[in-house]
């Protein structure tokens, strides 16, 4: 993916997210300090489970780890830190589950594959990763960095991600 293509995709994604935020009206726009289950967090970018949380999620789903990864997750890399990690794909990325997410797909629109749009909730709520449990749209907090750091030095191919 070229530089300008990346800028265009990012710009289009930001516009989409801005429109979605207006429609969904998350707690931050309502002046509330509790989750209103609008799904905006689950649409912007899925949460990042730690390697241990990923194993718990697979068990909750009644699957072997690699089986769950190949059905629901993708791999990515945090640019400046060279940390590879695994996280839930979006519904629009179902064609690349179990694979390393192509750069041009970073800004795909849509909800997390584990989010139930009709029921407006997480299908793995009881084992939802800490990065999602701690996320509060009404606060400016970084819940992803701690989860990302747990992936440092881990080969995500061991979790079933194909390159």
Model-inferred region functions:
Residues 1-163:
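Short loop/turn segments that flank or connect secondary-structure elements
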């Amino acid at each position: 993916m070229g530089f300008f293509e990346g800028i265009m995709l990012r710009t289009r994604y930001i516009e989409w997210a801005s429109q979605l935020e207006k429609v969904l009206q998350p707690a931050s726009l309502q002046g509330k300090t509790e989750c209103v289950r609008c799904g905006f967090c689950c649409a912007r970018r899925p949460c990042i489970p730690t390697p241990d949380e990923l194993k718990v999620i697979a068990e909750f789903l009644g699957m072997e780890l690699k089986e769950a990864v190949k059905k629901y997750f993708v791999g990515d890399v945090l640019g400046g830190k060279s940390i590879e990690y695994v996280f839930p794909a979006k519904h629009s990325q179902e064609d690349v589950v179990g694979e390393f997410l192509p750069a041009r797909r970073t800004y795909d629109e849509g909800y997390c594959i584990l989010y139930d749009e009709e029921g407006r909730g997480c299908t793995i709520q009881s084992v939802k990763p800490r990065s999602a449990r701690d996320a509060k749209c009404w606060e400016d907090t970084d819940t992803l960095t701690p989860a990302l750091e747990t992936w440092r030095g881990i080969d995500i191919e061991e979790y079933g991600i194909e390159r």
